[in-house]
Amino acid sequence: MTEPETLALLDMKEPETPEKSPPQALVLQSEEEGGTESPGTESLRVGSSVGSPIVREGPEDGPDSTISEAATLPWGTDPHPSAPLPDPPGWRDIEPEPLESEAPTKSEEPFKEDANLLPEKTVRAFVPIDLQCIERKPQEERILHRDAGPGELRNFLPARLSHPEPPERKWAEAVVRPPGRSCGGCGSCGGREALRAVASVVAALIFFPCLLYGAYAFLPFDAPRLPTMSSRLVYTLRCGVFATFPIVLGLLVYGLSLLCFSALRPFGEPRREVEIHRQYVAQSVQLFILYFFNLAVLSTYLPQDTLKLLPLLTGLFAISRLIYWLTFAVGRSFRGFGYGLTFLPLLAMLVWNLYYMFVVEPERMLTASESRLDYPDHARSVSDYRPRSWG
């Protein structure tokens, strides 16, 4: 191909490939490696800076021009693999576009939303645990606090939230049924318990008069001669001392249960083993007051022959309280029998006192005169009084 044809071809390709400068760099590197520079290379450098064609300003003859012409051909435009890539022309004139800040914000927003997916109650439940704090003894902790200054103490763990116990769980023991019994919720179990309690009270109603009559008829003792009202009241009070025995015994057991089960706090959670004895003592004291108040009034209306009932009723009170205590501690519905042996005599004495006060001797309701049952018509002289011979 002749030189004019080559120039014509370059003129036709110039607007299409104005940015192809890698062949020039390749020619420059090859010349630098050779160590010699030709005037054609200088013209190539000047031409590359100005942006005009290179071959027109160089010499027409010489091997360098041939190489430059061959390098500018379309089939020789591929850069050498080891050659550095040049910057595209006009890159300095391009204004840098501002970075879009919306993309990272969009990526951060779902991250923030994912961080708070757990509800607030669940997040509070996760409390960091320090194994050193758990394994540390109280003495070591005191030493560390003493050695550290006032400004060095820091709380790394957040304050633990106290989860109050729901009120439903406080009475869970009362709701739970015994494991050995199965109840379908039909209410038959409660009916059976009530039936047993009523049956035990009815048994006490039948057994109480039989026991009292048998003791009155067969026990070998008689009441002393008590002609005055004051002597009868003193005799009743002395008999009442024996009735305090089960109450004092209950107080002793109650105190021991407080010590054994460490239930010394007055407003602490009640324990079953302690509450049994406490309720027994409280109920016994109440019944003792009512029982012996009516017994003292009854002693002023009884004739001399029937004063033997005073010690018998006192003994019945003590025995019935012990029976009730035993059955109440076991948790049986049969405890109604012991309660009936205490309440039924109390009810009988109340009815007897009201009958004498309003029917037999209404004039002596609020006076302290002697009873006409003993004086003067129904009284026996001291010489006529003989104790019964037993044996």
UniProtKB/Swiss-Prot annotation:
Cytoplasmic side: 1-200, 262-279, 331-339
Stretches the record annotates as Disordered: 1-114
Biased composition (Basic and acidic residues): 103-114
Molecular function per GO: identical protein binding
Keyword Transmembrane in annotation: yes
GO terms of biological process kind: cornification; cuticle development; epithelial cell maturation; establishment of skin barrier; hair follicle morphogenesis; positive regulation of epidermis development; regulated exocytosis
Residue intervals on the Extracellular side: 222-240, 301-309, 361-391
Main location: other
Membrane topology, as annotated: Multi-pass membrane protein
Subcellular localization: Lysosome; Golgi apparatus, trans-Golgi network; Membrane
Sequence intervals crossing the membrane: 201-221, 241-261, 280-300, 310-330, 340-360
Origin: domain of life: Eukaryota
The entry's keywords: Golgi apparatus, Lysosome, Membrane, Transmembrane, Transmembrane helix
GO cellular component: cytoplasm; lysosomal membrane; trans-Golgi network membrane
Tissue: Expressed in the epidermis of the skin. Expressed in epithelial cells of the outermost layer of the stratum granulosum (SG) and in hair follicles (at protein level).
Disease: Defects in Tmem79 are the cause of the spontaneous matted (matt) mutant phenotype, a model for human atopic dermatitis. Atopic dermatitis (ma/ma) mice have a matted hair phenotype with progressive dermatitis-like skin inflammation and a scratching behavior. Mice display an altered skin barrier that facilitates allergic sensitization.
Function: Contributes to the epidermal integrity and skin barrier function. Plays a role in the lamellar granule (LG) secretory system and in the stratum corneum (SC) epithelial cell formation.
Protein name: Transmembrane protein 79
Taxon lineage: Eukaryota, Metazoa, Chordata, Craniata, Vertebrata
